[in-house]
Amino acid sequence: MSQSICSTGLRWLWLVVVVLIIDLGSKYLILQNFALGDTVPLFPSLNLHYARNYGAAFSFLADSGGWQRWFFAGIAIGISVTLVVMMYRSKATQKLNNIAYALIIGGALGNLFDRLWHGFVVDMIDFYVGDWHFATFNLADTAICVGAALIVLEGFLPSKAKKQ
């Protein structure tokens, strides 16, 4: 028996669209207004800095000859499809999990678009303390990390809170 999409976690797919719009919009603004390597200070310890990432998080496999572009694209597609299926199988009232899944899907698709369109991921957020700089990242990465943190948080909540 089929169920209404609004009664499933797919009801939260609108959040994927929001993440994509914000992520791709921010990357578009960077590409239109920055040359590669340009930096603009925003606040103490936070810069906008245009960088290209040919690998994964922390530029993992960035210098691997190009095959990693397709490898990470495949991972993004696989994870996104898996999470959409999980959203379909969950109730719309399971907000925390569905929000987490939507954030991860939105971030994965934002970076997937970059990999397929540009051949690299556009990064622009440079957090630093003194001379130490964290790896440059983007809003898609942030959405993925927040989504993953919500999944971990959900694991620590009492079962009554999980059902809501």
Curated annotation (Swiss-Prot):
It catalyses: Release of signal peptides from bacterial membrane prolipoproteins. Hydrolyzes -Xaa-Yaa-Zaa-|-(S,diacylglyceryl)Cys-, in which Xaa is hydrophobic (preferably Leu), and Yaa (Ala or Ser) and Zaa (Gly or Ala) have small, neutral side chains. The chain crosses the membrane at residues 12-32, 70-90, 102-122, 137-157. Its EC number is 3.4.23.36. The keyword Transmembrane applies. It is found in: Cell inner membrane. It is an enzyme of class 3 (hydrolase). Its main location: membrane. It comes from the Bacteria. It is a multi-pass membrane protein. PROSITE patterns: SPASE_II (PS00855). It holds the Pfam family Peptidase_A8. GO terms for cellular component: plasma membrane. Keywords: Aspartyl protease, Cell inner membrane, Cell membrane, Hydrolase, Membrane, Protease, Transmembrane, Transmembrane helix. NCBIfam families: lspA. Belongs to the peptidase A8 family. This is Lipoprotein signal peptidase.
